[in-house]
Every structure is written in structure tokens, then in C-alpha cells.
Amino acid sequence: GGAFSGIVNLTNSTFALTADNAAALASATLKLSANNVTTVGTTDRTIQGLDLSGGTLIFDGAAPQSQATGVVSVTDLALNSGTISVTGTDSWNNDTPVVAPNLSILAQDRGDIMLALINAGTVTGDAGALNLMINGTSVNSGSQAVLSTVTQGGVTVANATHNYGLTSSDGNGGTGLYVNYSLSALELLTDGSNALLLATESGATANRELNARLSGIGGVQVDAINGALTLANGNNSYSGTTTVNAGTLILGADGAFGQTSLLNVLSGASTNINGHSQTVGAL
């Protein structure tokens, strides 16, 4: 039962953090040492302590989520060495409106998004001492891009590029272990009614500026009814249609509408060139 309060040191083994196993560790510390592989699964678990010292800890989750499917809560967390492996789908749906814990494209573009893995009362060690793998791809913090596909209405509309890293702070006073990630690029694959939809969200803290680079033969549809949307990357090169369905689309840099073949502004919507310059194929 959970009365045991010592250290369970796992080496050369596999282990699943099931409900029964978590209950047995309620007052104990789980130490993951060399050649151990432990799987969290898809349910939140709580144990007393967790010591990462050479083993591998596997979570289920991926962008665009804000937390793993199963999050571990501990009183004490030691980050010494080992590997964090996050395995989830490499395809995600561009839902509007977004359903938590998923995040919108614009929220992913903020650069400070956290995928919560472990919530801890105290943390020792350094997240930088751990290796990170995303869907089998080894990630050098902040520099290794990981690709995924974006679907919309059952159609694959874009290829997304994210950059990932590990941190022990969520930026809001919380401690534990988090994957911080940001959306850096979108390759647009479709146009017209199947073009990628960029929709602004309500709320004072909502991000309404897209800095990710847009490329590809596809286009974008803009729904800015919850606040004007700014396309801010002057290196955008997409060649499809830019359709403003509602609200205002703002040109945030010279050429931020890429090589768009058509700027189509529907009745009641608007575009603000904002003092910048832009060439379009047609209006």
C-alpha cells in the first residue's frame, strides 16, 4: 500500500505508472535510473517524489495541447539525467472554437506555450540535464524543428513546424517539468474554401499577431471578428489567396502577405496596409 516511504530505484526495466502502482508510491520516491523505461499513460497520477537519474519517462501529448494527457503530480522532483519522451499524434485539427486543453494557431505562435508534464512542489537539478524526444525525434532545446500536419474539416491544409525545449518553470509561478514550444512556420497546402483558417480569439490576453512564416502554394482565410489580425512576418512567401471573411487584417511588415495571388476582402471586412508595402496578384 501507500505506507511505504522509501525509494523505489528502477534499473534495466520497464514500468507503468498505473493507478495501483501510483497508490503504492503515494508516500515514496520513484527513482528512474539507467535503462529503465517508465510510461505515464493517459491518466493523471500523484506520487510523493520523482527522481530522474538516467531512465526514460514517456508521456502522451503533443502540440497543440497545453498539458499531457496524463500529468504527474509530486511533492519533490529531482532533474538529474535521463530522457523525457513525448509521444502523441503528428497530425492535429485546426478547430474553431478551440476546445481545451488544445491551443489555437495564434496561441501556439506566442513563443511561451507550456505543455505541462509534471507538477511539483519543489524542484532540484536542471531541466537542461535531460534529453527531450518528440515523437521519436531527438530535440536540441530551441533549435530542432519538429514537423506535424494540420487538418481542417477532414482535409490536410498545412504542414506545421514547432520548436521545443524543456523548462522547470511555467512562467506563472508554477514549478515542475514543462515542454515549452512555439509555432515557427506553416506550409500552406490548400486554397479557396479549404484554405487554412486563422481566427482571432476574445480576451484581453489573446494573441492576434502571427509571426510564424507562411509559405507554400495554399492560402489563408481570416476571421478577425474577435479583434484585428496582424500578419507580421515579412519573409512570408505563400502564393495562394488571402481571404478576409470578417474583421480587419493588418499588414504588419512589408510583404507579409507573401506572394498572394488574390487579396479578397468580403463585404463588411477590411484590410489595413498600416504604412507598409505589399504586392498582390489581384484585388
Residue ranges of predicted features:
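Primary detection of the long, small/polar-rich alpha-helical "axial" segments characteristic
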Residues: 220-225
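Short, structured interface segments
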Residues: 174-182
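Surface-exposed loop/turn positions within long extracellular repeat scaffolds
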Residues: 1-76, 92-107, 128, 185, ...
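Residue-level marker of positions within ordered structural domains that often coincide
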Residues: 82, 184, 219
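Disulfide-bonded cysteine-rich modules in secreted/extracellular proteins
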Residues: 184-199
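A residue-level signal for beta-strand positions that form part of recognition/binding surfaces
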Residues: 176, 195, 207, 219
